[in-house]
Curated annotation (Swiss-Prot):
Coiled-coil intervals: none
Topology within the bilayer: Multi-pass membrane protein
Keyword terms: Cell inner membrane, Cell membrane, Ion transport, Membrane, Potassium, Potassium transport, Symport, Transmembrane, Transmembrane helix, Transport
Gene: kup
Protein name: Probable potassium transport system protein Kup
Organism name: Pseudomonas fluorescens (strain SBW25)
A Gene Ontology molecular function term of the record: symporter activity
Keyword Membrane carried by entry: yes
Subcellular localization, as worded in the UniProt entry: Cell inner membrane
A GO cellular component annotation in the UniProt record: plasma membrane
Primary site of residence: membrane
Length: 633
C-alpha cells in the first residue's frame, strides 16, 4: 500500500530478481494476514461462541480456517480479483473506477457500483484503525505469560508502541522499510517452525484438511455454525492487501509469495496450535504463545511486536494511498500531501489522515483493552470490504471482460455466497463492539457523498450565471479592453464557459493579458495518463486558448510542469510572465433545491477547510491571484 509498498519495492522493481520481489512482497502485502494467528484461535475458543476444546471441535475449526484460506485467498483473490487491475493498479478505489468504466452509460448501475466502492473504502478506514490496535495488543499480551502481574501494563505498552508508530509517519520510514521483508520472512519461518513442532505432538491434526470435518462441525453445532464464521474470518484479515498492493509488485510475485511461503506457514501454525489444544485444552487462553517453548517466549513477543508494527505500517500507508486516489477521483476534499522521499513518488504522508487514525486507534485500545474484545469489531470491516470487492469484480468480469455468463455466474454466485455468509455472521457483532467500524463507515460515506454531490451542485450554480466563451470573445472583438503583457491562466471546471475569476478581473481591473488560458484539469478513471495524452489545446483567437490537462488518479498534478509540455508558439508559460487566477467559492446554505440544509452546511464547512488549488496543483505562490465568490446552494 502506498508508502510502505514503495519502501519495499523501490525504483528497481522491474529489474529485481524474483527472490527479491518475493521478499519485498512478503514484507508489505502479508503483514496483516500474517499476524492473524496471534488472535484467531484465541477468539474462536474464548469469544463466547460455545465451541468446546475437544477433538471434533478443534478439527472442525481448523477445517473451516484451512478451506477459508483456500477458497477466499487462493481461489477468489489469486485467480479472479488480482486479474481485475486498473492498468496495473489495485485497491478499492482503483477497482471502483474500473467498474464505473465497465458500467458505461448505465447510470443506475454506475451509481450502485460507486456506492459499493465508497462503502468498501469507508469500511477500509475503519479497518485501518482496528488493525494496528488489535495486532499490537495481541502481540504485547504475550508479556502476560512471560511475567506475572504485567496485565495492567499491556495497554500502556501497546499505546506507547502505537503512538510512536504514528509519530514517525511524517518523517517517513525509508531506511527501516528495507528491513520489512527480511523481518516478515523470519516471522513466517518462525510461524511454520512452531507449527511443525506442534504437529509432531499430535500428527492426527492433519486430518482437518478433509472438508468433511467442517461439515460435521456445522451438523454438530447448528445453533452456532454460521456465527462461528465471525471468528474464523479473522484468519482472512488482510486479504484485501493482496489486491491493494498489486500496483507495486504485480500479480505473480504476490501469488508466488502466497503459495511458496505464506500459505504453508499459516496452515502449519494454525494446525500446530490445534495439535497443542488436542493435548492441552487449557492452552486455549492463548494458543499462539503457549505453542512456543518457555525459553522462546520473550524473543517471540519481540518478533510478534515487530511483525504487528510492520502490518500496521502497511495499513496506515494504505490509508494514505487510498486517500490520495479518492481526492483525485473527487470523493474527498483536497488535503496537503507531503512526500517523505525524494526518490519515491509513492512515499507520501497526509497529516489529517494520520492524526485521525491515531485518535481512533487510541480510543479503540482504551475502550476495548484486549485483542479478544476488539475481535468483535474487526470482522464487520473486513467482511464488508471483501463483499464490496466481490460485487465490483463481478461487474468487471461480466461487463468489461465479457466473460460468458455460463462460466462467470456460478463462480460469482459462490464468491458472493461465501462473502455474504461471512458478513452475515458478523452483523450480530455490531451490538458487541462492531458498531465502531459501521459508525465510522457511515460517517465517512456521508462525508464522501456530500463532497461529491456538493461539488456537482456548486458547478451547476456557477454555470447558471455563466457566459458562453464564444459570446464573450465576440464581445471582446467589438469592444477590446486594454491588454497587458504576459499570460493569464484561469482555472475553471467548465472549459466552454467564462470563469467567474476572469469576469471579476475584467470588471474591476478593466484589463486582459496578451494570452488568456482557460485551464481545466480532468481526472481519468485510470492510474496514469501518458505524457502524449496529457493535454489538449484549442486556440479561439483574440489571444484566448483552452487547455485541458488530463491526470490519472495516481499522477502527481503538477500544473506548471505539465504546461511546459504545451508546445504552441503563441503560448508563453515562462514563470515570470505567467499569472494564475484562482476562484475561491464561499458556499451559503439556502432553501434552493439541491441537498438537505445540514448537508449543504457540511459541504460549506468541508469546502472552507479543503486545501486550495494553489498547493494542490503546485502553483508558484508569488504568481497567484485569488478572487472570492459567494454561491447560494
Amino acid at each position: 500500500m502506498g508508502q510502505a509498498s514503495n519502501q519495499a519495492a523501490g525504483a528497481e522493481q522491474s529489474n529485481a530478481k524474483p527472490i527479491g520481489m518475493l521478499v519485498a512482497a512478503v514484507g508489505v502485502v502479508y503483514g496483516d494476514i500474517g499476524t492473524s494467528p496471534l488472535y484467531t484461535l484465541k477468539e474462536v475458543f474464548n469469544g463466547g461462541y460455545g465451541v468446546q476444546v475437544n477433538h471434533d471441535g478443534v478439527l472442525g475449526i481448523l477445517a473451516l480456517i484451512f478451506w477459508s484460506l483456500i477458497w477466499v485467498v487462493s481461489i477468489k483473490y489469486m485467480l479472479f480479483v488480482l486479474r481485475a487491475d486498473n492498468q496495473g493498479e489495485g485497491g478499492i478505489m482503483a477497482l471502483t473506477a474500473l467498474a464505473r468504466r465497465a458500467a458505461g452509460e448505465r447510470k443506475k448501475l454506475r451509481s450502485f457500483l460507486v456506492v459499493c466502492g465508497l462503502c468498501g473504502a469507508a469500511l477500509f478506514y475503519g479497518d485501518s484503525m482496528i488493525t494496528p490496535a488489535i495486532s499490537v495488543l495481541s502481540a504485547v499480551e504475550g508479556l502476560e505469560l512471560a511475567f506475572d502481574g504485567l496485565e495492567k501494563w499491556v495497554v500502556p505498552i501497546a499505546l506507547v508502541v502505537l503512538v510512536a508508530l504514528f509519530l514517525i509517519q511524517k518523517h517517513g520510514t525509508d531506511h527501516i522499510g528495507k528491513l520489512f521483508g527480511p523481518v516478515m520472512v523470519t516471522w513466517f519461518l518462525v510461524l511454520g517452525g512452531l507449527g511443525v513442532y506442534g504437529i509432531t505432538l499430535h500428527p492426527e491434526v492433519l486430518s482437518a484438511m478433509n472438508p468433511m470435518w467442517a461439515v460435521r462441525f456445522f451438523e454438530a453445532h447448528p445453533g452456532i455454525g454460521v456465527a462461528i464464521l465471525g471468528a474464523v474470518v479473522l484468519a482472512l484479515t488482510g486479504a484485501e492487501a493482496l489486491y491493494a498492493d498489486m500496483g507495486h509488485f504485480g500479480r505473480k510475485p504476490i501469488a508466488r509469495a502466497w503459495f511458496i511461503l505464506v500459505l504453508p506457514a499459516l496452515v502449519l501454525n494454525y494446525f500446530g496450535q490445534g495439535a497443542m489444544l488436542l493435548g492441552d485444552p487449557e492452552a486455549a487462553r492463548n494458543p499462539f504463545y503457549l505453542l512456543a517453548p518457555s525459553w522462546a517466549l520473550i524473543p517471540l513477543v519481540v518478533l510478534s511486536t515487530l511483525a504487528t508494527v510492520i502490518a500496521s505500517q502497511a495499513v496506515i500507508s494504505g490509508a494514505f494511498s487510498l486517500t490520495r486516489q479518492a481526492i483525485q477521483l473527487g470523493y474527498i476534499p483536497r488535503m496537503h500531501i507531503q512526500h517523505t522521499s525524494s526518490a519515491e513518488q509513492g512515499q507520501i504522508y497526509i497529516g489529517a489522515v494520520n492524526w485521525s487514525l491515531m485518535v481512533g486507534v487510541i480510543l479503540l485500545v482504551l475502550g476495548f483493552e484486549s485483542s479478544n474484545a476488539l475481535a468483535s469489531a474487526y470482522g464487520v470491516a473486513v467482511t464488508g470490504t471483501m463483499l464490496m470487492t466481490t460485487i465490483l469484480v463481478s461487474a468487471v468480469m461480466l461487463l468489461l471482460w465479457k466473460w460468458p455468463p455460463v462460466l462467470a455466474v456460478p463462480v460469482l454466485v459462490c464468491c458472493l455466497l461465501v462473502d455474504g455468509l461471512y458478513f452475515a455472521a458478523n452483523v450480530p457483532k455490531i451490538i458487541q463492539g462492531g458498531a465502531f467500524p459501521v459508525l465510522a463507515g457511515i460517517v465517512l460515506f456521508v462525508l464522501m457523498t456530500t463532497w461529491k454531490r456538493g461539488k456537482q451542485l456548486l458547478v451547476e450554480r456557477l454555470d447558471e450565471g455563466g457566459l458562453p466563451l464564444p459570446i464573450f470573445i465576440s464581445s471582446i472583438r467589438v469592444q477590446p479592453p486594454h491588454r497587458v503583457q504576459g499570460t493569464a491562466v484561469f482555472l475553471t471546471a467548465r472549459p466552454d464557459a467564462v470563469p467567474h475569476a476572469l469576469l471579476h478581473n475584467l470588471l474591476h481591473n478593466q484589463v486582459l493579458h496578451e494570452q488568456v488560458v482557460l485551464l481545466t484539469v480532468v481526472y481519468e478513471d485510470i492510474p496514469r495518463v501518458p505524457a502524449a495524452r496529457r493535454f489538449e489545446v484549442d486556440a479561439y483567437g483574440e489571444g484566448f486558448f483552452r487547455v485541458i490537462l488530463h491526470f490519472g488518479f495516481t499522477d502527481e498534478p503538477d500544473v506548471p510542469q505539465a504546461l511546459k509540455l504545451c508546445h504552441l508558439d503563441e503560448l508563453d508559460f515562462s514563470p515570470m510572465r505567467t499569472t494564475y487566477f484562482l476562484s475561491r467559492e464561499t458556499v451559503i446554505a439556502s432553501r434552493i433545491k439541491g441537498m438537505a440544509r445540514w448537508r449543504e452546511a457540511l459541504f460549506a464547512f468541508m469546502l472552507k477547510n479543503a486545501n486550495g488549488n494553489l498547493r494542490f496543483f503546485k502553483l508558484p505562490v508569488n504568481r497567484v491571484i485569488e478572487l472570492g465568490t459567494q454561491v447560494e446552494m
